[in-house]
Design a protein with these regions (language model features):
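Compositionally biased terminal segments of proteins
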Residues: 1-160
Length: 160
């Protein structure tokens, strides 16, 4: 899947979030590529502040193009964890992490930055700030027993 396809799928999800007034930001490899060295990725990571009362409409608005399981979404909200949705045609996965109540996560949401993602300057999405991408990558590196060069290379790419 090439970058325009990745952004096309990501934008579909984000437009639904915006329609439902769900605060979000893109993190992970897509964010580190936006601020540093581009690299291939197999998914999009989005942090979102989804509330239980938004799940029904979220499922309704996504189910024609994505596989989405409302029970998984409710469980992710309950346990402040994650769930994924898969684009039916492109088979591209979007991992959605529920915003945790940790001070860092709440601050990261307030520090998110909007960037243009295509030649059409109206196509803008919120990304985690470069500093928050670095901190998140270092946290994932530590949780992964400090063996993933990908996380460190992403950090170095942003710092350059």
């Amino acid at each position: 899947m090439n970058p325009p396809d990745i952004f096309e799928v990501t934008l579909k999800v984000i437009r639904v979030f915006e329609k439902l007034n769900i605060a979000y930001y893109v993190g992970g490899s897509l964010a580190s590529s936006a601020f540093g060295m581009p690299r291939t990725t197999i998914d999009t990571d989005i942090v979102a502040n989804i509330k239980p009362e938004q799940v029904f409409l979220l499922e309704e608005l996504l189910k024609n193009e994505f596989y989405i399981d409302a029970d998984m979404v409710h469980n992710a909200i309950r346990y402040q964890s994650s769930f994924n949705i898969i684009h039916s045609e492109m088979l591209f996965k979007v991992d959605i992490f529920i915003l945790k109540e940790r001070p860092f996560d709440c601050q990261a949401l307030s520090r998110r930055v909007q960037k243009t993602v295509s030649a059409d300057t109206s196509q803008k999405i919120f990304f985690a700030s470069p500093e928050d991408v670095i901190l998140s990558k270092l946290e994932w590196y530590k949780m992964g027993r400090e063996v993933s060069d990908r996380q460190l290379n992403d950090v170095l790419g942003i710092l350059k």
